[in-house]
A protein has these predicted regions:
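Noncatalytic, typically N-terminal accessory segments of nucleic acid-processing enzymes
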Residues: 1-157
Length: 157
């Protein structure tokens, strides 16, 4: 779970913490795809899920190209522990009351949208030796999956 407005606060109030890489290559790119899912989906105003999936894939490809990463680990939030499920349910029920073209509850493990996204990402990345995808069917939050992978493979990172 992210910290609301954290990144925006960092780049606004502490501009010196971010430096351009100026052509430096990044060996390992780890990212929690949920940080990309919401803005990518929100940018598709008509709520077309096919367009959303294509936008997500295009955004992933852009990130990989911009960084020049030789290894990529993509983590998507999986089913949450029971304690967090109630918190998520309350938050999502509140968001349903807002009028939206597309219901962001679809960005939940087990929904048709997430299953389709998982399938598309597996088709793209399963044969690639330099990309690992931990999809939304694997339990755990994206950032926890990333940290677990890093701990298990620290000798090669």
């Amino acid at each position: 779970m992210g910290i609301p407005v954290f990144f925006k606060t960092l780049i606004t109030d502490y501009q010196n913490v971010i430096e351009p890489v100026d052509g430096q290559k990044i060996d390992n790119l780890f990212f929690d795809l949920n940080c990309l899912l919401h803005p990518s989906c929100a940018s598709i105003k008509d709520g077309n899920e096919d367009s959303m999936i294509q936008k997500i894939i295009a955004d992933i490809d852009t990130l990989i190209q911009l960084t020049g990463a030789t290894f990529v680990y993509i983590a998507i939030d999986g089913p949450a522990p029971k304690g967090k499920m109630m918190q998520q349910r309350v938050r999502r029920l509140k968001s349903v009351l807002e009028e939206k073209v597309w219901d962001t509850n679809a960005i939940t493990p087990g929904t048709n949208f997430m299953n389709r996204l998982n399938d598309e990402l597996h088709q793209l990345y399963d044969g690639k030796s330099n990309v690992i995808l931990s999809d939304s069917l694997e339990p755990g939050e994206g950032e926890h999956k990333i940290l677990q992978y890093m701990k298990q493979h620290k000798s090669v990172l």
